[in-house]
């Protein structure tokens, strides 16, 4: 007889933060999964939720500036609200979340905010079909150069406020699968501050943004002076671009935009 209940491993929202000496803010450079817990490791912390069927053991190695973690099951589920899960992990360089299941998640806001040194993050397996909030998800992740979110399902998202704000080194952004029909807030979605690094050249989409429910889109491209639409359209002062520029560039038909159609 089969068991109708599938056992699972679920991590605490602030699990990794609770392990590092400065709660992630100033020390952790790497977060790595291992196959076992070494016998000589001290200060092992459990970072699973109360409802998790399996333990997740984690510890911090000061010599390697690394959080190591171990769990029996391959797949680790995230809880529904992971607001700020890696918020202010300012020294974190890379992160592989390919074994994490995000199918229950509704809130991804501030997930990587102020991950200043983060250069790459693998989100290829992320299930975002239930997510409603992506506010400031990558804000100030300023070393990421390329970000491919073409697998993201955004049908239920209502808040994209400052989602990619101040990603200084971002050169290309692929959001070709984005569905924005329910989004109400896109304030400073792609913007940056005056006087900071400006690298963003292309934003790839499959279709114009659906802005039928959009309420607020203040300065979505502020200070993005290198950004060009697919046919070269731009404004001398990107701050003047309003929500009508959230579309594929089509100047021949009087419809300039800051997006490039993905070929």
Predicted regions and their residues:
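Negatively charged
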Residues: 1-263
């Amino acid at each position: 007889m089969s068991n109708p209940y599938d056992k699972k491993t679920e991590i605490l929202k602030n699990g990794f933060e609770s392990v590092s000496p400065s709660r992630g803010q100033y020390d952790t450079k790497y977060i790595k999964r291992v196959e076992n817990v070494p016998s000589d490791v001290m200060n092992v912390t459990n970072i699973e939720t109360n409802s998790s069927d399996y333990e997740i053991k984690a510890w911090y190695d000061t010599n390697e500036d690394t959080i190591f973690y171990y769990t029996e099951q391959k797949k680790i589920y995230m809880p529904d609200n992971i607001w700020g899960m890696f918020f202010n992990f300012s020294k974190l360089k890379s992160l592989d979340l390919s074994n994490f299941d995000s199918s229950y998640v509704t809130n991804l806001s501030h997930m990587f905010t102020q991950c200043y040194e983060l250069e790459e993050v693998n989100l290829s397996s992320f299930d975002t079909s239930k997510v409603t909030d992506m506010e400031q998800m990558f804000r100030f992740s300023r070393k990421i150069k390329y970000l491919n979110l073409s697998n993201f399902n955004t049908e239920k998202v209502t808040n994209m406020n400052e989602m990619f704000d101040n990603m200084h080194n971002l050169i290309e952004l692929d959001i070709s699968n984005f569905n924005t029909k329910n989004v109400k807030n896109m304030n400073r979605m792609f913007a940056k501050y005056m006087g900071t690094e400006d690298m963003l050249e292309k934003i790839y989409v499959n279709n114009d943004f659906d802005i039928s429910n959009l309420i607020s889109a203040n300065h979505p491209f502020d200070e993005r002076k290198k950004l060009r639409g697919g046919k070269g359209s731009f404004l001398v002062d990107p701050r003047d671009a309003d929500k009508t520029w959230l579309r594929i560039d089509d100047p021949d038909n009087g419809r300039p935009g800051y997006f490039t159609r993905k070929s």
